[in-house]
From Swiss-Prot:
It catalyses: N-acetyl-L-glutamate + ATP = N-acetyl-L-glutamyl 5-phosphate + ADP. Its EC number is 2.7.2.8. This is Acetylglutamate kinase. InterPro entries: AceGlu_kinase-like_sf, AcgluKinase_fam, ArgB, Asp/Glu/Uridylate_kinase, Glu/AcGlu_kinase, NAGK-C. GO terms for cellular component: cytoplasm. Its main location: cytoplasm.
Amino acid sequence: MMTMADPSKMPDLLAKAETLVEALPYLQRYAGQTFVIKYGGHAMGDPEAQRDFAEDVVLLKAVGINPVVVHGGGPQIGAMLKQLGIESTFVGGLRVTDAATAEVAEMVLAGKINKEIVGWIAGLGGRAVGISGKDANLVLAEKVKRSEADPSSGIERHVDLGFVGEPVAVDPTILANLTNDNFIPVVAPVALGADGATYNINADTMAGAIAGALGAKRFFLLTDVAGVLDKSGALLTDLDRAAIDALKADDTITGGMIPKVETCVAAVDAGVEAAVILDGRIPHAMLLEIFTTRGAGTLIHR
């Protein structure tokens, strides 16, 4: 027996149908393409946001897009260090990482957070595989070199950040193999150096390097703000390098947004078609950005 739809619900049903139709050209455009997603920020600690993120990733794979997830975990590392009685020191936003801290960071990133994300995706029917930059020589790191001015003399001096690294080479073979076999790679930001040491890498930087090496169609950087804002607080939805340089010069782009924007520019320079900075706390923000004309963040392109 056929059941008739409740007439009062028809507007909602039609709106959903219109959304699906609106998505059609984007589904056709992005089928078979690779999207690299940097997952981090406070959304990682919110159970509803975790599920929203996992749903987005599983949906992308289901419609023929190849998502590659690279995650952070700074707050979780900090919490574990505090629990273990290990004090943290930061220089220029980077955690000074001695041998004990490096061991804890790898444990939290590769052993805990990585497998939690794999579990969320698996719980929704996705086939996720958790790896780190160490696996199959995915990422080769080298020690970050930093300097700062001495407060009294003004003379630049070297700052030893310990086992903090930056990617110098990426071999994306394992990621290509996993996506081709219908898996969703989930990557923890730790990697080996040529010296055999394990380095903790900023997740934004690592995700951008992986996106460039894969020639990804899109690089999504999920954070805790709507994107790049102008001085009145309004979202800037579309930026190229010239616009970014001007916004940095007049101090519109400042502070922690500078390295995020620079990571996106570097990814685009390396071959990514476009990068997007968007608020990971907004439910299904990626889907709004990908499949609607309205978008949901700041698109950075050549």
